[in-house]
């Protein structure tokens, strides 16, 4: 067996490459029945016109003389050099096919296996100047070559990509990384993928999403027949050469208890009490992680929380990000993405609910009460986590690479986030140690393990750890929604989020208004206002029931098309009326009133931006009329513009109006009244 490649195949950077390079480790795995040859040439390019063509190296000639029965080719990394790809990209496919032809001439029966390129990390000095894009283009060309030549295709990229510490110099895998590559080749050659494997989220009491195709998937040894039975439904399939298999059942109606059985060879997994209903993911930071026993309603509601139709999947961290130093064992686990505890689906009961997210529980309970079908809630929130930690690596690499660089000293990331992370990993020596707050980390440790488990939508409560830079958050939040919708292959997946509450932090007025505008800019999103439930001194207000239920209102109105108001009054526009009066119009206004029965409070107007004065406010039907003797020509209006606000405008359902800031125009607008 010939391993054809460059310095990665050769084992550059590995202290004992004769023992730990990927070909050497592969030899150990395969045993004496195989002879593995390492024909890696550091710096080699696939391109004949590259700066060091593999065709011209002694390693190429040695590989031809080896007359391999199997050849694994991993070339193309060095072709990302600006001397190569920009000039000779049109020759890549033909040059690769020529290399394959050469191996086939040496042995017409040779089994050719092409490898998708291993990752190049963002720390590479040329990453943002072209290397990242060219790396992707070469990946696509390798897939084309595999199709044309009829060669097998394996993946060196996916298993290394979430583990940047395996690439100490951003390019060459260390011994552990080389071992992962060897295992990929070993499994491809032998078909041994360790037998039947299913996603960890498949357990007893799981809930499958109703009214959409139900896909069951996993791993098995190559070629093995996999049989899947869901209730009375049955399908079988065969695991492909990469060990992957899946079956898809037609959409099913809600069902309270069925059985899922998956078997392959002598292995069988049986999952009992499987329900079919509605599945939602609840995520974010500490206010979503905030547990029921901490909530103001705990003593009343926990004893009554037993519900066989409400199923919970609680992903709790192994280590909270308290103000402590973690030991080396913890740091090693973090590097290997072992941050969350093992979990399993459970039916709601007082013992389970007491430690479950309060917001997620009330969200799920209201959906279950309203829809009268089983509801499954997955919660993976992590206290203190910033938005960027929840976004996939490729999205940040291609659309916000600056946030990845030197993240512990990166001004895009909130100082408190960086300081807490630095404290937790203080015992680490050298670079490369990861932390839950690091960009991408929680996507890789908390989203990827879900393995695209079908969810109806997302309920999100986060933002406190990004309120220092509103403009950056506006970019990051859009990337987050795009990232998750792409991951679940659902471009219109509902994404409902909580606006930050009231707290005595000066940037929060602007942040709340930014969140309001984000809802208007991103399709299929909705925002639950919580400013009326805040605590001036506590970032974790205890009144969570209304927040969870406000999120559920959005889902019921917007996703399930129930006839109810999704939210409180949302600013539509403001215009000048006679004299110095301003009329403010709202969407979702219903019957405007105040939460306390007192005069409307919280409006300000200004002639010059930045010089606002309190306005007398009067409700007239669907409008609020404003006036101030100190403002002769009003041009700007704002509402609830205090970090801790006592603004009191609500609609007919008692739902509060959002903080907003806007310009005063000369013409009225049409509001949406629901």
Residue ranges and their predicted role:
Residues 2, 8-97, 133, 247, ...:
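Conserved SGNH/GDSL esterase-like catalytic core that processes O-acyl groups on lipids
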Residues 241, 289, 301-302, 306, ...:
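Catalytic-domain carbohydrate-binding cleft regions of carbohydrate-active enzymes
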Residues 28, 54-195, 366, 439-531, ...:
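Alpha-helical cap/lid subdomain in secreted, periplasmic
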Residues 217-300:
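Extended acidic/polar, glycine-enriched regions
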Residues 296-346:
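N-terminal structural subdomain of ketosynthase/condensing enzymes
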Residues 193-222, 274-282, 289, 554-573:
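Non-catalytic, glycine-rich low-complexity segments
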Residues 199, 206-209, 274-292, 301-304, ...:
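Low-complexity, Pro/Ser/Thr- and charge-rich linker/hinge segments at domain boundaries
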